[in-house]
Regions:
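N-terminal subdomain of nucleotide-sugar transferases
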Residues: 1-38
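Helix N-cap/beta->alpha junction signal
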Residues: 9, 101-102, 150-153
Length: 153
């Protein structure tokens, strides 16, 4: 099975890693698309850790803009949707794997639905209050075809 995994920041990759590792052990083809903070000098170019872990980065999509945070996330989401559309068209995955409640997950859910790809959403049930992440997470869960919550074991 061909899997596209979108990750934009070290904190989500840390959670995705064991899932990706198990998928790799099961001989699935994993295509990682790195975006956002992974590609930033300010955040220590954490995409290099993905490579060090033995995963192939199929595409890098630069979405960080030097504007205020609200404008940056909104415009960056637009850039991510455009770039991810090209990646999905070229790679033709069986499904798209995303985690959480950031712009990466909503972008992947939108692209996956418009391009008739299954969307698997991890960690959709973890509430965060006081910012846009909560409604984004709920929207991604609605758009996802498979929804996985984490359990203690």
């Amino acid at each position: 099975m061909k899997i596209l995994c979108l990750t934009g920041i070290k904190s989500d990759y840390d959670i995705l890693y064991p899932v990706l590792d198990e998928l790799r052990k099961a001989k699935h083809e994993i295509n990682v698309v790195a975006s956002g903070a992974h590609l930033s000098d300010h955040h220590n170019n954490t995409y290099e850790r993905i490579i060090d872990d033995g995963f192939f980065i199929s595409d890098k999509i630069d979405t960080l803009l030097s504007t205020d945070r609200v404008v940056q996330r909104s415009k960056g989401t637009g850039l991510l949707i455009q770039g991810l559309t090209q990646s999905v068209e070229r790679l033709n995955p069986d499904f798209i794997l995303v985690l959480g409640d950031r712009e990466e997950s909503i972008s992947a859910a939108i692209v996956g639905n418009y391009m008739d790809k299954l969307v698997v959403h991890l960690s959709g049930g973890d509430p965060v209050y006081g910012n846009a992440d909560d409604p984004i997470r709920f929207a991604v869960s609605k758009l996802a075809h498979i929804h996985c919550c984490f359990a203690s074991e």
